[in-house]
Every structure is written in C-alpha cells, then in structure tokens.
C-alpha cells in the first residue's frame, strides 16, 4: 500500500526579511502541493500576496500550539495533522531535500537565518499560555461591573492595607507563577489566625497586590515558608496587643540579583524590592489568614512596619559574617530571616573611637528595649552602620568580639531592676533580686550590617516581649 502523501504547514510573518525573501518559494510550493500546503501568517493577513488561501494566525493560536520559535518554519504533517518533522529559517539545500522539490528557490541565496516568532515577543508567552494553555487557577474569579473603578474595588473588598494595590489580573498572577517551578496548587501551609490553607497561587496573588515583580517571587515564597514555621509563632504575633510584626532580613546573591537595598536608607522608602516583598507577606496574612486590624489584630499602637519591614544586609565586608552565616548558612546561600520586631530605635554615638567605648554605648541603648528594667523578655536586632563597623574593625575587633562585649555590658544585678527599684513599679519579679541577669537570652541578640557609609548612627529593632521558646524566635529559610 503506497504511503500517504504528506501535507505541509508554513508559518510566516510579513515583518521578517527571510519570510519576504521566500515569497517565490511559497508560490513554487503552492504549485507543487496545492491544497496540501497551508500558510499561517502571524501579523499581516495580506501577506504573502502570491498565496491567497493564507490563514490568519494573528491570534497565534496555531503558532503557540506547535511551539513555533522561528519564522519561517515549515512543518511536514502526518495525515492526521500531527507533526512529522520541521525545518526553519532558509537553507536552500535543506528545503529542497525536505520537500523533494529539486529546483526550489533556485535563484535565491543559499542561506538566510530566520526571525523570532511573534510567540516570543516580550511578555507574549504568558499571554498565550493564559489564552490557550491549561487552566492553572483555583482561586475564585471576581467579576467587576463596567462602571466599577478597579482600584476602588480592591479597597472596597478589603484586599488593601490602606495603600493602593495592583489589581491581581489573571495575566499578572500567571507571570508571577512563572517565576517558580513550584505547582500553583501546592499547599505551603496554613496561614493564621484563621489557619486557612495557603497555596502557591494565593501567595502569587498577594505578591501582585503588593506590587512585586515576578523575579521577587522566590523570595516572597521563602518568607512565607519561614513565617509558617512553628518557631516563629505567627499566630501569637498576630494576636498580640504589642507593637511587633514580621521583620525580613535577606542575605546572599539574591539581594544583588533583584536589586534590594542594604545601603543608604536601607530601612526607608524608595526600593521596590524591599518595599513589596515585605508588603506581600503582610497582605497574605490579611487576605488569606484573616489577620485584620480591629479583628484578631488588636495591637494597642502597632508600628509602621506592619505595612512592610524588609531590607537586605550589607555583605560588602568579607571579614564580617552575615546574619545568615551566624545561622549556619554559607555566604553564597540566598536566605531570608524573619524576626518579630517593633519600630526602629536610633542609636547616636559620634564620639567613640575605640571598640570598648562604642560597645558600652551601644549596650546602653540596647538596655532600653521594651523597658530598662525588663530583662530576658524581648530579643533584639542591632543594626550596625558602616562607620560604626569601621570603629570596631580599626580596633581589631571581630563580630564575635562585639557580641561578647555587648553581652558582658548587658549584665546587671537583680537589685537594680526588680519591681519598685529606683521608685519605679515596673521591673522584674522579686525572685530575681539576688540574681545576675542578662538583658537578652543566649540567642536573643542578632547583629546585622546595613546603612549608608556616612553617619555614625546605628539602630535597634526591639523584639516581641514573648521572645524565645515561649513565643517567637528568629527563623531562617534558604531558597
């Protein structure tokens, strides 16, 4: 039984010099194969003029289905329309052998590379996947009336933290999901306080709302994974009347790859990655977990970090271990650490020129975390600026020396801090009167580097007064 005659499909676009070059070839193929040749045009349906039966593929449906990357592409098809083989670009001998037309394009140049398919235009892959690919989304679609303002609709539905959000359209969410290899329906964990199952898709939706770029998404996912660790005690943190909220410190190559700020104004405004990664976690807590102010969130005052509290560590000094390295990771690891912290407390010391003096000075500020007379209750982060770091470095001190000196300076006799001492009712219980106490538990003081190179200023982020095993501990997540 003779083999079935193959059919051919040619995909072209007018805006391609190589496609324009092979117009005579298209005419030859049409004469040879007649109805066995189909020509799909990605841009201008009037092209090619020599083949009036051309098929409009401006929707790119056919091109997407056949994964066309270069035009012209010539497909040889089985009788059922499935692909048998393909060639692309223009190579005279290859096309002659592929089609069996010995004189095909005889007067043309021997070779000319093809052009990029319109399916590869910037951003088009996600557009086509959304239009023609399998359905990925499990989240409920919200239809808006034509007269509804999309920005106001986000406020009215309670999706915002009080600032404008980016509407999470299917295309934006899909582009966010494309930034990870994890499945959209993978459950990361349950988000308190309502303990709602949280999928990768839900994280993506809130990352879009926060204004994240897709390349930030792995960091957002890692921060959510860290926040859901039992050691972090997110449920308790959300329910407390205290000031605290999640503080994110990011280490490793990712900070440079996505342009995070650990330098000038590191804890301030102006850096999109810093601002939106932290905000994504806060919005997720609100929109998925139900942690809404006035509801389960009954903070007496709160702090501005409940919008976003995220920064990169300055790792430019190779002799100074990063926070991630303190937690057992390597310098080349990308790591996000979460701390239950309050607002920022400035530390001014423009006079100390010796490590000993500066350590004593920093310790005085650290004593005031939560209250001068409350010890071993709240952890803290000490952010040391480059100029203060220089004082330690020039004095020959390592980070370990700084930590040891601070712990030594933070020891105090219980008689100084028990309730009623110095005429102040607040303080430690009477049972600590005859003890020597340290301001922080053994793993309660975390030293981080950040800030601009000008200014003898450092800072303290005080922790939740339920720090430690009874409440929240700093957690880290490699990604």
Q: Where are the predicted features?
A:
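Non-transmembrane, aqueous-exposed alpha-helical and coiled segments at domain scale
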Residues: 128-479
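Structural motif
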Residues: 11-15, 40-44, 385-387
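Thioredoxin-like thiol-disulfide oxidoreductase module
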Residues: 43-71, 76, 95-101
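Non-catalytic, surface beta->alpha helical segment in thiol-disulfide oxidoreductase systems
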Residues: 70, 75-111
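Short active-site neighborhood of thiol/selenol oxidoreductases, capturing the structured segment around
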Residues: 2-26
């Amino acid at each position: 039984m003779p083999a079935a005659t193959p059919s051919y499909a040619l995909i072209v676009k007018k805006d391609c010099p190589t496609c324009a070059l092979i117009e005579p070839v298209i005419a030859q193929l049409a004469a040879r194969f007649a109805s066995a040749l189909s020509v799909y045009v990605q841009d201008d349906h009037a092209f090619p003029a020599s083949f009036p039966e051309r098929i409009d593929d401006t929707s790119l449906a056919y091109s997407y289905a056949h994964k066309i990357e270069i035009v012209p592409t010539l497909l040889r098809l089985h009788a059922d329309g499935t692909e048998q083989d393909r060639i692309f670009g223009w190579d005279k001998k290859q096309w002659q052998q592929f089609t069996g037309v010995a004189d095909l394009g005889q007067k043309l140049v021997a070779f000319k590379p093809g052009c990029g398919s319109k399916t590869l235009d910037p951003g088009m892959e996600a557009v086509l996947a959304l239009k023609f690919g399998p359905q990925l989304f499990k989240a409920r679609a919200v239809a808006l009336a034509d007269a509804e303002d999309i920005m106001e609709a986000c406020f009215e539905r309670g999706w915002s933290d009080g600032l404008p959000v980016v509407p999470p359209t299917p295309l934006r969410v899909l582009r966010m999901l494309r930034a990870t290899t994890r499945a959209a329906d993978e459950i990361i964990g349950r988000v308190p306080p309502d303990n709602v199952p949280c999928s990768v898709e839900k994280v993506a939706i809130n990352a879009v709302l926060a204004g994240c770029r897709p390349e930030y998404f792995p960091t957002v996912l890692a921060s959510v994974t860290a926040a859901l660790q039992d050691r972090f005690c997110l449920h308790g943190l959300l329910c407390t009347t205290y000031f605290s909220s999640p503080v994110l410190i990011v280490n490793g190559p990712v900070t440079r790859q996505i342009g995070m700020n650990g330098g000038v104004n590191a804890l301030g405004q102006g850096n999109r990655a810093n601002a939106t990664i932290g905000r994504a976690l806060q919005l997720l807590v609100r929109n998925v977990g139900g942690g809404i102010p006035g509801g389960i969130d009954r903070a007496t005052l709160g702090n501005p970090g409940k919008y976003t509290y995220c920064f990169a560590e300055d790792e430019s000094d190779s002799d100074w271990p990063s926070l991630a390295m303190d937690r057992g990771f390597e310098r080349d690891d990308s790591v996000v650490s979460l701390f239950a912290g309050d607002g920022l407390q400035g530390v001014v010391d423009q006079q100390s020129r010796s490590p000993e003096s500066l350590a004593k000075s920093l310790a005085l500020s650290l004593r005031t975390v939560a209250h001068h007379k409350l010890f071993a209750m709240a952890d803290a982060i000490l952010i040391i600026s480059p100029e203060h770091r220089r004082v330690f470095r020039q004095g020959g001190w390592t980070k370990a020396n700084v930590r040891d000196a601070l712990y030594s300076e933070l020891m105090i006799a219980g008689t100084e801090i028990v309730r009623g001492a110095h005429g102040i009712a607040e303080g430690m219980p009477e049972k600590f009167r005859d003890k020597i106490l340290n301001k922080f538990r053994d793993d309660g003081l975390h030293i981080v580097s950040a800030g601009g190179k000008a200014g003898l200023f450092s800072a303290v982020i005080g922790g939740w007064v339920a720090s430690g095993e009874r409440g929240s501990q700093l957690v880290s997540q490699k990604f």
